[in-house]
Amino acid sequence: DIVKKQKAEIANKFIKASINYNLKEEAYYSKEFKEIINSHDSTYAPLALFFLIDNKILNSNEEINHLFDQILNNVNLEREIKNLVIYKKGLINADFQPENIMIEILKPVINSESFWKPHSLLLLGDYFLFKGERQKAKDFYSQILTSQKTNENIFNQAQQRILKNYGE
C-alpha cells in the first residue's frame, strides 16, 4: 500500500509540474522533474526526462546523458521501454557524438530483436550518411531491409535512401 501511495504521489507531482510548467519558473520545474527522475519510477522517470528535453530545459549534453544513464542504470524498465530510452538517447546524441560513442549507445538495441532495432539502424544509417561515410550508411540501411522485425514505414525509408543515394 505504501508503494501505491508513493506511485500516486509521483504521478501527481508529474501531472502538476507538466500542467503548470512555465518559463518564468524554469529552475523550480527543472528541480521538480529531476526529483521525479531520482524517484526511479518506471513510468514517470522517463517521462520527466523527456519533458525536460522536449521543452529544452536542460542546456548541457553532459547533464542530459547523465540523466539518461541514471534512468537506464537505476530504473526497472520493461525491455522495450528501456530500448526506447536507449534509442532516444541515440537521437539526442547524434548531433555531437563521434561514431564510437553512437555505436556504443545503440549497441544494446541493434544487437537485439527489439521493436526499436530498425529505428536505431535507420538512425545510424542517417548518421553515417550525414558524415559522408556512404558505405557504413548503406550497411545499416541494408540491415533494415533484411530484418524480420522491420515495420513497413522504416523499411520504405531505408529502401528510399538506398535508391536515392546509391541508385540500387
Stretches with model-predicted labels:
Residues 7-19, 46-50, 83-87, 121-122:
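Alpha-helical tetratricopeptide repeat
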